[in-house]
């Protein structure tokens, strides 16, 4: 159920050096295009500091300049943060959210616990009563709480 983040995305490759230098993770990029223009939505996160409105406004200006110089179509740009109950959508988000509390569905019920450690194909999930190694392919749903 959990998909793999596409690092071959053109927008990702244009901004990854900038966000990396700022200690900001790119969680998700959505690109919507029609004949004349498009919309680019980017979800960002930082473990080290809060991404407040002033920071996002400044970052928006820089990313917009980078994308306008390189993309051959018109677009609008939206930057946002993940929110407190974000669905975890890719395997790499388990690494990004290590130490965070999540609700996890493996069978048909949600269970609350923490992401202790993320590995290449799995992660350690800790509840009040157990620690278990969970393969990403076994995850039906996961979200932050």
From Swiss-Prot:
It is found in: Cytoplasm. It comes from the Bacteria. One of its GO terms (cellular component) is cytosol. One of its GO terms (biological process) is ribosomal small subunit assembly. Keywords: Cytoplasm, Ribosome biogenesis. Required for maturation of 30S ribosomal subunits. NCBIfam families: PRK14630.1. Belongs to the RimP family. This is Ribosome maturation factor RimP. It comes from Borreliella burgdorferi (strain ZS7). The lineage of its organism: Bacteria, Pseudomonadati, Spirochaetota, Spirochaetia, Spirochaetales.
């Amino acid at each position: 159920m959990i998909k793999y983040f596409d690092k071959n995305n053109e927008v990702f490759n244009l901004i990854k050096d900038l966000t990396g230098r700022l200690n900001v993770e790119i969680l998700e990029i959505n690109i919507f295009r029609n004949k004349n223009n498009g919309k680019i939505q980017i979800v960002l996160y930082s473990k080290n500091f809060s991404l407040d409105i002033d920071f996002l406004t400044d970052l928006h200006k820089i990313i917009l300049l980078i994308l306008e110089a390189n993309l051959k179509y018109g677009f609008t740009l939206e930057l946002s943060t993940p929110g407190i109950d974000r669905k975890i959508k890719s395997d790499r988000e388990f690494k990004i959210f290590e130490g965070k509390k999540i609700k996890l569905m493996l069978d048909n019920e949600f269970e609350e616990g923490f992401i202790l450690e993320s590995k290449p194909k799995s992660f350690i999930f800790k509840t009040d009563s157990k620690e278990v190694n969970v393969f990403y392919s076994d995850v039906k749903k996961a979200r932050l709480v």
